[in-house]
């Protein structure tokens, strides 16, 4: 789910969203249903093991699976990604095979078959890099009609053959009908359910969650978020997601993200226009300078297309995704998640300006051309003065509430938690 789309249930108006950014799906039951395991043969004989499958999509699925599994495959179009700097990220891979998975990769997705060669291709590259046996992959799919379901279903034997634990389920939850935020929260919790239910007995004590939106992402983007979380001593690191509503990219997740001063990343007046989107961190000099210097900066909340975070508060069941409580500012589930992280003592949350993402291959090419690939901005941080974040232990006293653009208020950061 796209976090900015949480706005559709409010009086908040946002710029037109690219066609690639489709809302999540209609659904009938709120609980995910694990599909039966298909035959390893992804050819025509697999249809009997894929319930509700479209025969045409089943026929096309092997082409996508081949592309997903082979980073050099050119049969389907996708964002070109550079090979990552092995030496920079090698330390992320455990030196010995772990008895418990350390990396939990989570994803909610619907109607994104065209993006799978890049998105799932990068995830599979991450499995290989980090050690397939050290990883678990959890995907909740939302009744796609474009082949996404069939591809992800038939991918199971290939992922399991690598040695990675693969959790795949469908959900009929429709965030577009009725209250949106509770459903988006439930979908995210579904993706995390194997981690939470498995708990500390099944997952490593220092486990990491890599939670991705349906973005055009490279392996180096995923690894950089994981690296910066460790390098900075952060609890959570986010990239930056962008959208093209005109010729220039606009920061997308403005409804969710709040600066360490509690404000939105750019100013949105009462009429809801995004004309000041270019003026990011306009009222916070330190954050603005660090952003343009491509140095990570502490924030109150973020999501921004992809995050790396410690699994500790999830394993200990201190936080989960949720909707606003009575008397609490109407806000999106990722902002509430960050608020609850602060409340649980996990307030080292940072955005990483070197990781720039968009929601389609075509727009991904544009954003990488405009903002640069991650590898163009990283390296030699130890030689850069004040690269590391000077963490603030306390959250801002108040945080901007944007339940409606025409009625923005400042509320205590821990409103409804006191």
Predicted regions span which residues?
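Short beta-strand-to-loop acidic/aromatic patch adjacent to the donor-nucleotide binding site
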Residues: 201-217
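Active-site-proximal specificity loops/subdomain of glycosyltransferases
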Residues: 147-206
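Active-site donor/metal-binding and catalytic loop motifs
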Residues: 321, 344-368, 377-383
């Amino acid at each position: 789910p796209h976090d900015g789309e949480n706005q559709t249930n409010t009086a908040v108006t946002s710029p037109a969203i690219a066609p690639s950014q489709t809302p999540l799906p209609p659904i009938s039951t709120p609980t995910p249903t694990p599909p039966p395991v298909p035959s390893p043969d992804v050819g025509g004989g697999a249809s009997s093991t894929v319930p509700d499958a479209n025969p045409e999509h089943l026929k096309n699925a092997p082409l996508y699976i081949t592309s997903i599994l082979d980073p050099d495959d050119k049969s389907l179009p996708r964002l070109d990604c550079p090979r990552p700097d092995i030496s920079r990220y090698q330390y992320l891979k455990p030196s010995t095979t772990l008895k418990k998975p350390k990396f939990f990769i989570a994803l909610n997705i619907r109607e994104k078959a065209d993006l799978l060669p890049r998105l799932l291709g990068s995830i599979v590259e991450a499995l290989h890099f980090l050690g397939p046996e050290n990883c678990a992959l959890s995907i909740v799919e939302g009744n796609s009609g474009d082949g996404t379901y069939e591809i992800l279903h038939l991918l199971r034997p290939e992922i399991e053959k690598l040695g990675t634990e693969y959790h795949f389920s469908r959900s009929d939850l429709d965030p577009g009908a009725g209250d949106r935020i509770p459903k988006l929260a439930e979908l995210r919790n579904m993706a995390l359910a194997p981690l939470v239910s498995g708990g500390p007995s099944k997952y490593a004590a220092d486990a990491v969650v890599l939670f991705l939106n349906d973005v055009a992402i490279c392996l180096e983007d995923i690894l950089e978020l994981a690296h910066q979380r460790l390098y900075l001593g952060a609890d959570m690191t986010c990239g930056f997601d962008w959208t093209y509503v005109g010729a220039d990219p606009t920061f997308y997740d403005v409804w969710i993200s709040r600066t360490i001063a509690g404000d939105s990343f750019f100013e949105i007046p009462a009429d809801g226009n995004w004309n000041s989107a270019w003026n990011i961190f306009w009222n916070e000099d330190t954050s603005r300078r660090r952003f343009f210097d491509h140095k990570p900066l502490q924030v109150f909340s973020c999501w921004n297309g992809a995050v790396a975070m410690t699994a500790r508060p999830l394993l200990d069941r201190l936080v989960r995704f949720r909707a606003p409580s009575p008397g609490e500012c109407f806000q999106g589930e990722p902002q509430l998640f960050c608020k609850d992280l602060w409340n649980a003592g996990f307030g080292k949350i940072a955005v990483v300006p070197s990781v720039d993402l968009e929601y389609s291959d075509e727009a991904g090419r544009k954003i990488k051309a405009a903002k640069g690939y991650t590898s163009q901005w990283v390296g030699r941080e130890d030689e850069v003065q004040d690269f590391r974040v000077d963490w603030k232990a306390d959250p801002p006293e108040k945080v901007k509430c944007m339940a409606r653009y025409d009625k923005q208020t400042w509320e205590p950061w821990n409103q409804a938690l006191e």
